[in-house]
């Protein structure tokens, strides 16, 4: 089995779709996108005062919350406040827009939904193999999911790098976690699966066109082998050839022969027919003279050579039969 075999392509597409969906779902649902140093705040109520204790520790964060990795608040998680009160940004700047998009996490969630739809299309293509547009829809879903994923990653990086609540030293002391790399890997796999699905659709379309052409050729060859079709075709070809050459058909008929019209006048002059027997007896041309038969036949044989063969039987009977 080669790499471009249909079974191998379908297996790779199915495995890739499951992997991309699983990786993106894990990335969205976990809190290990970013490792950085932050402040874990807590409030403790005593008898007469409320004290706030701020402690800067190592934290890990995701799309939804931040958790402490060390200190007295190890394992404590809190929701991410994307719009703190002490932040020095204006509401009409691009920073506010990035924070709004970052807070909604719309692009990662949209990527998960599109990956799920693409997986359903791939599963449906196995049950409805005659509907080739399903695999094309799967490819479109996966490509769109990859684009939505990479947009969400770019927005996350931009929002984290431009966080005004962090000092310059804190902005440089962070690293991305395995959830972030799961999302990036999901983007790569989703794009590969989308391209492979579109390639499968193109291959199937080419096979269908080749099969249709072969079927049309076989039907045409089968029709030409039918005897009635061949007979009609021969008649049409003959009629067309006759219509293009009318002069040859007229010349070939015996009526058009030049010597054929001269023969009756010659024979009638040999035997003069008369209704009066007396005139027939006195007229020298009405009697048949056997002495001059040989000389007359010699003159009569001077008929054109090209007409002698076709009229031989008729002239022989008329020469030997007296009237």
Swiss-Prot record:
Brain. GO terms for biological process: eye blink reflex; membrane depolarization; membrane hyperpolarization; neuromuscular junction development; neurotransmitter receptor localization to postsynaptic specialization membrane; positive regulation of protein localization to basolateral plasma membrane; positive regulation of synaptic transmission, glutamatergic; postsynaptic neurotransmitter receptor diffusion trapping. Changing residue 143 to L: In MRD10; significantly reduced ability to bind GRIA1 or GRIA2 AMPARs; cell surface expression of GRIA1 is reduced in transfected hippocampal neurons and HEK293 cells producing mutant protein compared to cells producing the wild-type. GO terms for molecular function: channel regulator activity; ionotropic glutamate receptor binding; voltage-gated calcium channel activity. It is linked to Intellectual developmental disorder, autosomal dominant 10: A disorder characterized by significantly below average general intellectual functioning associated with impairments in adaptive behavior and manifested during the developmental period. Glycans are attached at residue 48. The modification Phosphotyrosine is found at residue 271. Regulates the trafficking and gating properties of AMPA-selective glutamate receptors (AMPARs). Promotes their targeting to the cell membrane and synapses and modulates their gating properties by slowing their rates of activation, deactivation and desensitization. Does not show subunit-specific AMPA receptor regulation and regulates all AMPAR subunits. Thought to stabilize the calcium channel in an inactivated (closed) state. One of its GO terms (cellular component) is glutamatergic synapse. This is Voltage-dependent calcium channel gamma-2 subunit. It comes from Homo sapiens (Human). Belongs to the PMP-22/EMP/MP20 family. CACNG subfamily. Residues 233-261 are annotated as: Disordered. The modification Phosphothreonine is found at residue 321. The modification Phosphoserine is found at residue 253. Pfam families: PMP22_Claudin. The chain crosses the membrane at residues 10-30, 104-124, 134-154, 182-202. Keywords: Calcium, Calcium channel, Calcium transport, Disease variant, Glycoprotein, Intellectual disability, Ion channel, Ion transport, Membrane, Phosphoprotein, Synapse, Synaptosome, Transmembrane, Transmembrane helix, Transport, Voltage-gated channel. The gene is CACNG2. Its main location: membrane. It is a multi-pass membrane protein. The L-type calcium channel is composed of five subunits: alpha-1, alpha-2/delta, beta and gamma. Interacts with the PDZ domains of DLG4/PSD-95 and DLG1/SAP97. May interact with GOPC. Acts as an auxiliary subunit for AMPA-selective glutamate receptors (AMPARs). Found in a complex with GRIA1, GRIA2, GRIA3, GRIA4, CNIH2, CNIH3, CACNG3, CACNG4, CACNG5, CACNG7 and CACNG8. Interacts with GRIA1 and GRIA2. Interacts with MPP2. Phosphorylation of Thr-321 impairs interaction with DLG1 and DLG4.
